[in-house]
UniProtKB/Swiss-Prot annotation:
<dbReference type="InterPro" id="IPR030475">
    <property type="entry name" value="RNR_small_AS"/>
</dbReference>
<dbReference type="Pfam" id="PF00268">
    <property type="entry name" value="Ribonuc_red_sm"/>
</dbReference>
<keyword id="KW-0408">Iron</keyword>
<keyword id="KW-0215">Deoxyribonucleotide synthesis</keyword>
<protein>
    <recommendedName>
        <fullName>Ribonucleoside-diphosphate reductase small chain</fullName>
        <ecNumber>1.17.4.1</ecNumber>
    </recommendedName>
</protein>
<dbReference type="GO" id="GO:0039693">
    <property type="term" value="P:viral DNA genome replication"/>
</dbReference>
<keyword id="KW-0244">Early protein</keyword>
<dbReference type="InterPro" id="IPR012348">
    <property type="entry name" value="RNR-like"/>
</dbReference>
<feature type="active site">
    <location>
        <position position="115"/>
    </location>
</feature>
<dbReference type="InterPro" id="IPR033909">
    <property type="entry name" value="RNR_small"/>
</dbReference>
<feature type="binding site">
    <location>
        <position position="208"/>
    </location>
    <ligand>
        <name>Fe cation 2</name>
    </ligand>
</feature>
<dbReference type="GO" id="GO:0006260">
    <property type="term" value="P:DNA replication"/>
</dbReference>
<feature type="binding site">
    <location>
        <position position="171"/>
    </location>
    <ligand>
        <name>Fe cation 2</name>
    </ligand>
</feature>
<feature type="binding site">
    <location>
        <position position="205"/>
    </location>
    <ligand>
        <name>Fe cation 2</name>
    </ligand>
</feature>
<dbReference type="GO" id="GO:0009263">
    <property type="term" value="P:deoxyribonucleotide biosynthetic process"/>
</dbReference>
<dbReference type="GO" id="GO:0004748">
    <property type="term" value="F:ribonucleoside-diphosphate reductase activity, thioredoxin disulfide as acceptor"/>
</dbReference>
<feature type="binding site">
    <location>
        <position position="77"/>
    </location>
    <ligand>
        <name>Fe cation 1</name>
    </ligand>
</feature>
Length: 334
């Protein structure tokens, strides 16, 4: 581990005199935590009953495209959780930041559960489910992306600043195009449950990504050189390009609402915004190819009354009775 550098970082310095969160010593970080706390939701609070008919009516090439996205998501969130639990939450000593990452880890667990529910609901065939749940083994590009994430999260090879840049790239660049692709289903007025999940998860991930950028700009002493930041971000973009090509090949190039060239441009537009948040020069200097979805891109999805969304007929949507029973236990069952 890079001790000679890491020991200079305020985030990693133990305060032996501080045992409680109050009095707050880092109010901006505390505000980030409270913002994240306000977004709390659970995976059971989205109804996917209508999605089953929409999914079955969807052309097979389009279904194949979205299956690749689900395969990525079920793997990616687990790797994010792994990094939080084994690295950041063990290393970070500033309590307000640690509170944020504790809340983020809980949210990522909700996201992971939500993706599993989506797979179980939409894909009844158990062998096909397993192919999606085993994304790293079955999809070479997903394995490559997972290896890249673990490479940049490794504390023995990278400074804290480099790892935070990599973390922002994961939460932002690697996820963003997939969020956009799912959101286009809303314009087709189909898959309302999947779209609702997507809006809640993308909103959460937007906060996670922005917080990483905030720490880089305000707390990291050893900020990576701009060329290193650009290297990390460009590597992430190249991986996304490769995934998009792979997913479009599976869909035989037919996905309603957008082309892969539009997704290529969008991820570069998004990456330039990340550069701005990290106080770096932009890399690609391209416009937004999806101006009609600006509100979604800015994570301005209105907070929903989740009690109104709480489903009452989920057992009819999930074809695995044992799985459904486990999902819908209430407090009286414990």
């Amino acid at each position: 581990m890079l001790i000679f550098i890491s020991n200079m970082e305020e985030l990693l310095i133990e305060n032996s005199q501080r045992f409680t969160i109050f009095p707050i010593q880092h109010p901006e970080c505390w505000n980030w935590y409270k913002k994240l706390e306000s977004l709390t939701w659970t995976a059971q609070e989205v109804d996917m009953c209508k999605d089953i008919d929409d999914w079955e009516a969807m052309p097979k090439p389009q279904r194949e495209f979205y299956k690749q996205i689900l395969a990525f998501f079920v793997v990616a969130d687990e790797i994010v959780i792994e990094n939080l639990l084994t690295n950041f939450m063990r290393e970070i000593k500033v309590k307000e930041v640690l509170y944020f990452y504790t809340m983020q880890a809980a949210q990522e667990c909700v996201h992971s559960e939500a993706y599993s529910i989506q797979v179980k609901t939409l894909i009844p065939d158990e062998k096909e489910q397993q192919r999606i749940f085993s994304g790293i083994e079955k999809h070479p590009i997903i394995k490559k992306m997972a290896q890249w994430v673990r490479q940049w999260m490794d504390p023995d090879r990278n400074t804290l600043g480099e790892r935070l840049v990599g973390f922002a790239a994961v939460e932002g660049i690697l996820f963003q195009n997939h969020f956009v692709a799912i959101q286009f289903l809303k314009e087709q007025n189909i898959m309302p449950g999947l779209v609702s999940y997507n809006e809640f998860i993308s909103r959460d991930e937007g906060v996670h990504c922005s917080f990483a950028c905030f720490l880089i700009s305000n707390y990291v002493y050893n900020i990576p050189e701009e060329k290193i930041i650009h290297k990390i971000l460009k590597e992430a973009v190249e991986l996304v390009d490769e995934f998009i090509n792979y997913a479009f090949d599976k869909a035989r190039g037919r996905v309603p609402g957008f082309s892969k060239e539009m997704l290529f441009q969008y991820i570069r537009y998004f990456t330039d915004n990340l550069c701005f948040m990290m106080q770096c020069k932009s890399i690609y200097k391209v416009g937004n190819p999806f101006p009609q979805m600006t509100k979604f891109f800015l994570n301005e999805v209105e907070k929903t009354n989740f009690f109104e969304l709480r489903p009452t007929q989920y057992q009819n949507c999930v074809k695995d009775d044992a799985f459904a029973f486990k999902l819908f236990l209430n407090d009286d069952d414990f």
